[in-house]
Curated annotation (Swiss-Prot):
Transmembrane segments: none
Protein name: DegV domain-containing protein BH3627
Domain DegV span(s) in chain numbering: 4-281
Gene Ontology molecular function: any one: lipid binding
UniProt KW ATP-binding keyword: no
Binding sites annotated in the UniProt record for hexadecanoate: 62, 95
SUPFAM superfamilies, sorted: DAK1/DegV-like
Length: 283
């Protein structure tokens, strides 16, 4: 039986306990405030990041892991007797992390590195990792795992509502005119991943109406399914996340609802107060 390791990056926001339970290795991305870089969830927690954000005039930037960090990780796994690594990462359209993993894989001898572009991030990415880890424990071969991840991708969706448009503007996803008009009209864009990129799905007036629409879109997919895993993801807005989670639980008894968070790297792009809803149609 092939000895397979699962590697991912920090934007899955697994946390140390869950990563250990799954038996996966996490390579961190970084956020950069001025000249200072911090590995997210290692040198800078999500709570500290959002607190720091309140006192900084300039929005931080983000940085993918260096190729060398992946090389070190893969070399260590090779020495530990692993024959194959399946390296699962956030969308290659929003970060070069996936490409860094592939580059590192081509530089390391004695182990095969198979990259997997999740086309998404955060809890949906974590679900890819969890599904892969489960199959590894069941003794599946690499191709079976990749084929299963492709099936998971077809049944995964996520929608986000951004609280403050200025983060999207400063990150280059909205121009100045869109920012002014959107702010004046209280427009709350519903965002989603399309071919791996974060793009507006619909533009709705007021946050309340935006979330009503998100629940409608969720219902269109979830109502006819028999088993659904949903996650409410928040950027330092636990009260809003809990409220939405309770609403979904009361409306859909067959949906397993959990709560997760946008950590520093993804929080930099979406901004504090943003909330997302992701789901995976199990059957």
């Amino acid at each position: 039986m092939t000895k397979i390791a699962i590697v991912t990056d920090s934007t899955a926001y697994l946390g140390p306990k869950r990563a250990k339970e799954l038996g996966v290795i996490v390579v961190p991305l970084s956020v950069v405030f001025g000249e200072e870089a911090y590995q997210e969830e290692v040198e800078l927690s999500s709570a500290d990041f959002y607190e720091k954000l309140k006192h900084e005039e300039k929005l931080p930037t983000t940085s993918q892991p260096a190729v060398g960090l992946f090389v070190e990780t893969f070399e260590r796994l090779a020495k530990e007797g692993f024959e194959v690594v399946i390296s699962i990462h956030l969308s290659s359209k929003i970060s070069g992390t996936y490409q860094s993993a592939l580059t590192a894989g081509s530089m390391v001898e004695g182990i095969e590195v198979i990259g997997y572009d999740s086309g998404i991030s955060c809890e949906p990415q974590a679900n890819f990792v969890a599904e892969a880890a489960k199959l590894v424990k069941e003794g599946a071969d690499p191709q079976t795992i990749i084929d299963h991840l492709d099936e998971v991708k077809k049944r995964t969706n996520a929608l986000f509502v951004v609280h403050d448009l200025s983060h999207l503007h400063r990150g280059g996803r909205l121009n100045a005119a869109q920012l002014v008009v959107g702010s004046l009209l209280k427009i709350k864009p519903i965002l989603h991943f399309e071919d791996g990129s974060i793009v507006p799905l619909e533009k709705v007036r007021t946050e309340k109406k935006a979330w009503a629409r998100v629940k409608e879109l969720f219902a269109e997919e979830a109502s006819s399914a028999s088993s659904v895993k949903a996650t409410v993801i928040h950027a330092n807005r636990l009260d809003g996340a809990e409220k939405l989670a309770d609403e979904i639980r009361s409306q859909f008894s067959h949906v397993d609802v959990s709560i997760s968070h946008f950590g520093p790297v993804i929080g930099t792009h979406l901004g504090e107060g943003s909330i997302g809803l992701s789901w995976y149609i199990e059957k």
